[in-house]
């Protein structure tokens, strides 16, 4: 009751006999990563030969069983040109696909994987494709208002609001029972369900209590930034990339926020111009 359960899985080990069970438990969502519609690119990223065909087949079986599925397509240098095809595939199946074009550092604070992160120039090309093909992203982004408009009415309330849902409305549980705040934050263990109840962890973990104290006021620079609404601020991104410093503001995140704002304005002007010419 009052609990939504989602599963994050590559689905390569999904068995046919498990599908009725997944349907019976009434999952909120199964999310899986599909990095490209090119099998070679997908398998190169996963380092598992044949994983593309297995994941794709599993997605289609789940869709056929009317189990909610969402495709995640994190972008990096190896698959930066393939999101549009993944999105079209998802649209064909009538399911949602989303991308993350800012690669996150590893949960163990190792940043060596960021060599594969998209440059600002590559991110711009990807964002232009997203504005063109991803209707949901387009609708959400084009309806954003400058944050100043919202803040001037009740800035005090805004500053007291949490940065995200971490510690408030979501957590993750691994197969070994470890509980952590959100996907990508595996090293920040809150407790273990084999040693204590989830209720006890959620209500009494000192780490959860600490996360709940973090609000928009903890980031004064962000609170006054004109690109605030176009920024995907994320505690775990900062934590992983900045040697465990939740309050760090890596420059790349800020650059992408301003890029997103600029492209949104350009695209909006393009739409308005087309409407006037019609």
Label each region the model flagged.
Residues 1-8, 12-28:
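Conserved Radical SAM active-site core
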Residues 8, 72-74, 225:
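Short hydrophobic segments within beta-strands
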Residues 13, 36, 103, 231, ...:
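Flexible, active-site-proximal loop/turn residues at the rims of small-molecule/cofactor binding pockets
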Residues 14, 78-82, 218:
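Short, conserved alpha-helical segments within structured domains
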Residues 15, 40, 235:
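Glycine/Thr-rich phosphate-binding loops of Rossmann-like dinucleotide-binding domains
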Residues 20-29, 33-176, 184-193:
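Radical SAM enzyme [4Fe-4S]-AdoMet core and its adjacent flexible, acidic
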Residues 179, 184-278:
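Flexible mid-to-C-terminal extensions adjoining Fe-S/redox cofactors in radical SAM and related proteins
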């Amino acid at each position: 009751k009052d609990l939504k359960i989602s599963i994050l899985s590559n689905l390569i080990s999904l068995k046919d006999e498990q599908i009725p069970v997944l349907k019976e438990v009434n999952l909120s969502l199964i999310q899986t990563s599909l990095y490209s519609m090119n099998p070679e690119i997908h398998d190169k990223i996963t380092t598992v030969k044949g994983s593309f065909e297995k994941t794709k087949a599993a997605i289609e079986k789940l869709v056929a069983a009317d189990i909610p599925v969402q495709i995640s397509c994190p972008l990096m240098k190896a698959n930066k040109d393939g999101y549009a095809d993944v999105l079209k595939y998802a649209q064909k199946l009538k399911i949602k696909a989303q991308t993350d074009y800012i690669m996150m550092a590893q949960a163990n604070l190792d940043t060596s994987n960021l060599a594969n992160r998209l440059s600002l120039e590559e991110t711009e090309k990807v964002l232009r494709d997203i504005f063109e093909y991803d209707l949901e992203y387009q609708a959400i982004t084009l309806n954003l208002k400058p944050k100043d408009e919202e803040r001037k009415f009740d800035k005090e309330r805004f500053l007291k609001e949490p940065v995200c849902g971490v510690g408030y409305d979501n957590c993750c549980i691994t197969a070994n029972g470890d509980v952590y705040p959100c996907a990508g934050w595996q090293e920040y263990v809150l407790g273990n369900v084999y040693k204590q109840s989830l209720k006890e962890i959620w209500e009494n973990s000192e780490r959860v209590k600490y996360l709940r104290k973090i609000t928009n006021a903890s980031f004064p620079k962000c609170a006054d930034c004109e690109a605030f609404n176009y920024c995907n601020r994320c505690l775990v991104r900062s934590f992983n990339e900045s040697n465990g410093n939740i309050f760090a503001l890596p420059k790349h995140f800020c650059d992408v926020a301003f890029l997103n704002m600029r492209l949104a304005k350009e695209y909006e002007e393009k739409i308005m111009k087309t409407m006037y010419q019609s």
